[in-house]
A protein has these predicted regions:
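N-terminal, intrinsically disordered low-complexity tails/presequences enriched in Lys/Ser/Pro
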Residues: 1-4, 11
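Catalytic glycan-binding domains that act on GlcNAc-containing polysaccharides
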Residues: 8, 16-158
């Protein structure tokens, strides 16, 4: 079976994805499910749920079909924009053999939370864990600020 990679195919896929997400958000189904999955990951890894919600908000805008192709050619997928290629050992551990599996909200939040947890263990604080989640480049402090601003918003709503 040939791989569909034409521009028209990607545009159609994004359009269908947008319609599906819009329907889920309108019905309240999507966000309720995300809240439950975030609560589960928060309890499992000891990550404040506001941090997980903030990362999801900044990374994907709560779109479980979010996709991003990076400058290095790797791809981020799903709610937490998990990068398959940069996390091969975790992919193996979770039995993920196809990057498309990362569109599953439960699996994506589980793996994303695990990455964030490992970063926290490595650096000992949430600010550096968040920075490392996006990459340790010196120029990604804007990302950290965006996430922390969202954390404040979510704290007010909980």
């Amino acid at each position: 079976m040939p791989l569909k990679t034409t521009r028209a195919w990607h545009i159609q896929r994004e359009r269908e994805s947008f319609e599906k997400v819009l329907e889920e958000v309108s019905s309240g189904k999507n966000t309720t499910n995300i809240h439950a999955l975030v609560e589960k990951a928060s309890l499992k890894y000891g990550i404040p749920k506001e941090i997980l919600m903030a990362i999801i908000s900044v990374e994907s805008g709560f779109n479980p079909r979010a996709y991003n192709k990076n400058k290095d050619g790797t791809e981020d997928r799903g709610l937490m924009q998990v990068n398959y290629q940069h996390n091969l050992s975790l992919m193996k551990e979770y039995g993920i053999t196809d990057p498309e599996q990362l569109y599953d909200p439960e699996l994506n939040i589980e793996v994303g939370a695990r990455i964030l947890y490992e970063n926290y263990k490595r650096f000992g604080n949430w600010v550096m864990a968040i920075k490392a989640y996006n990459g340790l480049k010196a120029d990604n402090w804007d990302y950290v600020r965006k996430v922390l601003n969202k954390v404040s918003e979510f704290r007010r709503s909980y």
